[in-house]
Design a protein with these regions (language model features):
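Dinucleotide-binding Rossmann-like beta1-alpha1 core, especially the glycine-rich loop
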Residues: 59-142, 274
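Flavin (FAD/FMN) cofactor-binding and adjacent substrate-gating region
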Residues: 103-178, 183, 194-197, 280, ...
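Core beta-strand elements of the Rossmann-like FAD/NAD(P) dinucleotide-binding domain
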Residues: 210-218
């Protein structure tokens, strides 16, 4: 159906099983999961699909090596299982990618090797190659432009890489094949309630400037860093459930890497992780982790972030990138779940949480691309428990 036909479909006063607010990774995933079970689904995205965080990732499908230091083994295990599933299920937009951790201090080689062996162990019977220690010559072979002053060797491991925006569009198209109806440039302005229970939404189509009343049995809020604004349409709460964090990436020319392998800086002076990742004819450098107060759909990189990335990655290149070598910059916002016990965003977990309000609104926050499928499945499972009719069939994904 074209856009006009879709809105005519809404005007028939159909009551959908699910209304999903938000057309990023989680929203599209929920639309696909629910529609594949046989439920009727309408999804509304205020901007374009994957306009926000979901198209501004580091392009990695990974378990999260850095979470091992925080003993978040369950999170790593789930992410590694989902990594393998996603690689098999979407092989046309994913690929394996090798990384090297260059080592300049003797004991660190074994420290990183031990951590990555634990990563291998948690991944179980994965089809990814196992990590291994490599000597200085091999590091230079894999990373021709690496700074070899004081280089002692390194550790090599593999993870997944993907095209985030293309995967998002593919998920949306697949959901439509299962019968879901997806709308972009359509914002939810208010809820329709009966006896304080949500029964639908009022949607503004920014293309035609029309308002549509759309009814449903379940409404799921999947708006990422903007989740609080949708919750506030339901009820005012003084407590924010989201603590947004900004991540900036620099894109430089491929000549600075000269390899199909990337490298990982496991610990910067302030305890963060940085990547240099081959991406088509370019190299992605990133990312930062800075708290922000008010989320924006088009966040702007800060000069301090640009300087931070360049300062830390320069130490690892022989031919060093300068500001004039930056081809483009992109910035995304992480929808981290707020935790009063953690003062810094870099210490917050990438775990997701699912909230249900008294009115029946389900909000899912947190998570990342790697685990989008599992998060979507759990969210729809919870919604099904609230839904009076049983699922026509089980999740097929």
């Amino acid at each position: 159906m074209n856009r006009k036909q879709k809105f005519e479909y809404l005007n028939k006063n159909k009551v959908f099983d699910f209304i999903i607010v938000g057309g990023g990774a989680t929203g599209l995933g929920c639309a696909l999961d629910a529609s594949s079970r046989g439920y009727s689904v309408a999804l509304f995205e205020k901007h374009d699909f994957c306009k926000g965080t979901s198209s501004r990732s580091t392009k990695l499908i990974h378990g999260g090596v850095r979470y091992l230091e925080k003993f978040q083994f369950k999170l790593v295990y789930e992410a590694l299982k989902e990594r393998d599933f996603l690689m098999k299920n979407a092989s046309h937009v994913t690929n394996k990618i090798g990384f090297v951790i260059p080592v300049y201090k003797p004991l660190l080689k074994f420290y990183y090797w031990f951590g990555l062996k634990l990563y291998d162990l948690i991944s179980g019977d994965s089809f990814f190659p196992k990590s291994k220690i490599i000597n200085k010559k091999k590091v230079q072979e894999l990373l021709p432009n690496i700074n070899n002053k004081g280089l002692l060797g390194g550790v090599c491991f593999f993870d997944g890489q993907f095209n985030d925006s293309r995967l998002g569009i593919d998920i949306g198209l697949t959901a439509e094949k299962f019968g879901a109806t997806l709308f972009n440039y359509s914002s939810v302005e208010s809820f329709i309630k009966h006896n304080d229970i949500i029964k639908g939404v009022n949607v503004h189509d920014s293309v035609s400037n029309n308002i549509y009343e759309v009814k449903s049995k379940i409404v799921i809020n999947c708006t990422g860093v903007f989740s609080q604004s949708i919750i506030n349409l339901d009820y005012e709460t003084p407590k924010n459930i989201i603590k947004p964090s900004q991540g900036t990436h620099l894109v430089i020319e491929r000549r600075f890497l000269k390899s199909d392998f990337g490298f990982l800086i496991p610990k910067t002076p302030d305890g963060r992780v940085l990547f240099a990742i081959p991406w088509h004819n370019s190299v992605i450098l990133g990312t930062t982790d800075n708290e922000i107060n008010e989320p924006e759909i088009d966040p702007k990189p800060k000069l301090s972030e640009i300087n931070y990335i360049l300062k830390n990655v320069k130490q690892y290149f022989r031919e060093k990138p300068e500001k004039t070598d930056i081809k483009t910059i992109y910035t995304g916002l992480r929808p981290l779940v707020a935790d009063s016990s953690k003062s810094k965003s870099k210490d917050l977990s990438r775990k997701h949480k699912i909230f249900k309000s008294k009115s029946g609104l389900i909000s899912v926050v947190g998570g990342k691309w790697t685990t989008y499928r599992k998060i979507s499945e759990k969210t729809v499972d919870i919604a099904c428990l609230l839904y009076t009719s049983p699922s026509p069939r089980d999740c097929r994904l």
